[in-house]
């Protein structure tokens, strides 16, 4: 982490620094990964000045520029893996849900997307010995699906699984939930999440998981018809990159749930497709397709990953949480 303050950056005085902080740019790292247009609008300065400030921040934070592959490999060792709680699922994911990446869960209603999100919110708070990341959780809830009672059930399930005394109240205190009422509010909440994550990091409770459940609900409701598609995708693209930036800044896993649609011209194979188009497809690091099976079983397919082969895992969603089948 950089030791210099915003005010020490060339071109940033006390007034500009205050505007940046009000907009959520509290650290050198946050400025370093911003775009010139974004910074110019926020601080009411010219784009050329904003570009100089960003370049100075990148040098101070040692962000940007070319690196050799071995250095990237060394830095990749900082990436954490959050256990899913299921051995087969973890193996398919190369050890668990990665930090500094967006993992998309898509599937039809009742396929278990929200259940997985709840389970990850519990697992991430466990110590590394038990597959967790010792972290806090931020949830952006767009469909009013967060249920604290479900968290308590899952904590009880982990208590029985590991033979430990775990307090559901403590787990709930480390989960910070905000309800998003429209797409603008949803995007704004990512900025608010950045402020909260900075505060929690200073308190020794780093955020290691950001959940958006569900990603596309408001965008689908507000942007209807082909005429609005370009505007929707542009706005969605900005939102997805804001989520990616959050994951990088805080070494956190970003998990988004997504709705599906049926592709009417698909005569062969599964017609189910995730909504959000190429914007979501290109920005999500890992794409997981959830399908219902018999009873409480769910089939999870790894559809896309930069480093892992396609594969399937079968899990069970029980009262105690996710388990191997």
Swiss-Prot record:
Record-level GO BP terms: DNA recombination; DNA repair
GO molecular function: ATP binding; ATP hydrolysis activity; ATP-dependent DNA damage sensor activity; damaged DNA binding
Keywords on record: ATP-binding, DNA damage, DNA recombination, DNA-binding, Nucleotide-binding
Binding residues for ATP: 107-114
Source organism, top-level taxon: Archaea
ATP-binding is among the record's keywords: yes
PROSITE patterns the record matches: RECA_2, RECA_3
SMART domains linked to this entry: AAA, HhH1
A UniProt-annotated Pfam family: Rad51
Signal peptide range in chain numbering: none
Family of this protein: Belongs to the eukaryotic RecA-like protein family.
Main function: Involved in DNA repair and in homologous recombination. Binds and assemble on single-stranded DNA to form a nucleoprotein filament. Hydrolyzes ATP in a ssDNA-dependent manner and promotes DNA strand exchange between homologous DNA molecules.
Stated name of the protein: DNA repair and recombination protein RadA
């Amino acid at each position: 982490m950089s030791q210099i303050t915003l005010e020490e950056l060339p071109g940033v005085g006390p007034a500009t620094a205050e505007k940046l902080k009000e907009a959520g740019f509290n650290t050198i790292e946050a400025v370093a990964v911003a775009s010139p247009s974004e910074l110019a609008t926020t601080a009411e300065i010219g784009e050329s000045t904003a570009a100089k400030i960003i370049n100075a921040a990148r040098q101070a934070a040692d962000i940007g520029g070319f690196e050799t592959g071995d250095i990237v490999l060394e830095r990749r060792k900082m990436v954490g893996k959050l256990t899913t709680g299921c051995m087969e699922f973890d193996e398919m994911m190369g050890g668990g849900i990665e930090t500094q990446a967006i993992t998309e869960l898509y599937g039809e209603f009742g396929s278990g997307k929200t259940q997985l999100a709840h389970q990850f919110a519990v697992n991430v708070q466990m110590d590394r010995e038990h597959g967790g990341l010792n972290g806090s959780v931020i949830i952006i809830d767009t469909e009013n699906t967060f249920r604290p009672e479900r968290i308590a059930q899952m904590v009880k399930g982990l208590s029985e699984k590991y033979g430990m005394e775990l307090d559901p109240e403590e787990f709930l205190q480390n989960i910070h939930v905000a309800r998003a009422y429209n797409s603008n509010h949803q995007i704004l909440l990512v900025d608010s999440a950045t402020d909260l994550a900075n505060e929690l990091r200073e308190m020794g409770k780093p955020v290691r998981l950001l959940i958006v459940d569900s990603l596309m609900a408001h965008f689908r409701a507000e942007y209807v018809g082909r005429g609005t598609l370009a505007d929707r995708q542009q706005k969605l693209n900005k939102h997805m990159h804001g989520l990616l930036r959050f994951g990088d800044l805080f070494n956190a896993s970003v998990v988004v749930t997504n709705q599906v649609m049926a592709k009417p011209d698909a005569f062969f194979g599964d017609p189910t497709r995730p909504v959000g188009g190429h914007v979501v497809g290109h920005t999500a690091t890992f794409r997981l397709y959830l399908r219902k099976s018999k009873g409480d079983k769910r089939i999870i397919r790894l559809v896309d990953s930069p480093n892992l082969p396609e594969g399937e895992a079968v899990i069970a969603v029980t009262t105690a949480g996710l388990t191997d089948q």
